[in-house]
């Protein structure tokens, strides 16, 4: 009898515990529904970029086209499960059920042309690659939400700041994903030229402080990693180099800009950031033993990226302040200066 009462009491306590947790969870969702909705919209937008990224990627049945070459003895058999008609760009016809390459046989030029045809066709989408990329993106969004929901910033995180970060993340993610598919920016060292991550981190640091900018730097860097990772299980320099460069450049930008007080100081920030970006490319090329003839062009490109990021940050700062209804340290310094023309008129 006592045992039954104890079991009944335990079950009642468990139900109360579950109800309390459900109530707390419900209240938390109500309090942060706008942030959760915004994160969900950002995730769906990034997923759309992911889909087009994977659909236009050079992967065949979860294997990368770069793993094959003419004359190589195939280590697996790849069979076409869909027919692909010939076109002007690639006049090769692929029949459904046709074995493109056979394990143990060398790959001919015709075989490689068919592999390339399959990789470029939107009819062949690497589902595993897309799922891997989506899982990484989901974990990234969860980490993002946890950081900005539970880390003590000493101030209230406004929804306007989250909107700004999500928009900037999508711009960086999209430019990295699609820029790496162009021939001129296909190298992991050249793709960093067009990644505007440092620009957004500078604006974030000026408007919302260094801590937010550092966290945002990690989010952007992980986004760049996923955009160049293609959902593969092989971590190569093609995704590591852009990730490390973006992380170093963004964290450096957030550290450099923290003590400036005048707008003219942004020119110095631009020069210093250009030098840091150039040094990072040289260091990464040494670490990964990269030797290529276009290194001087890449160095000029990343230096320009760093310099123009600081200049554009200064130019975009005023309209961003207006749109986000916030004030930067420059605006506060102007208002505290009694010699400022605006203050003279008010006085």
Segments the model singles out, each with a brief description of its role:
Residues 140-160, 164, 169-184, 201-291, ...:
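Short helix-perturbing small/polar motifs within transmembrane alpha-helices
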Residues 1-164, 295, 316-321, 347:
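Membrane-embedded alpha-helical signal segments
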Residues 83-87, 107-115, 185-192, 214, ...:
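Hydrophobic alpha-helical transmembrane segments
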Residues 217-219, 266-347:
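Acidic/His-rich, divalent-metal-binding segments that scaffold phosphate/diphosphate chemistry
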Residues 2-18, 181-195, 217-225, 257, ...:
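Juxtamembrane helix-loop transition segments at the membrane interface in multi-pass membrane proteins
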Residues 114-117, 121-129, 175-180, 190, ...:
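Glycine- and small hydrophobic-enriched segments that form the cores of compact globular domains
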Residues 17, 123, 195, 199, ...:
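Juxtamembrane loop-helix boundary motifs flanking transmembrane segments in multi-pass membrane proteins
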Residues 129-138, 188-195, 238-246, 271, ...:
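Alpha-helical transmembrane segments of polytopic membrane proteins
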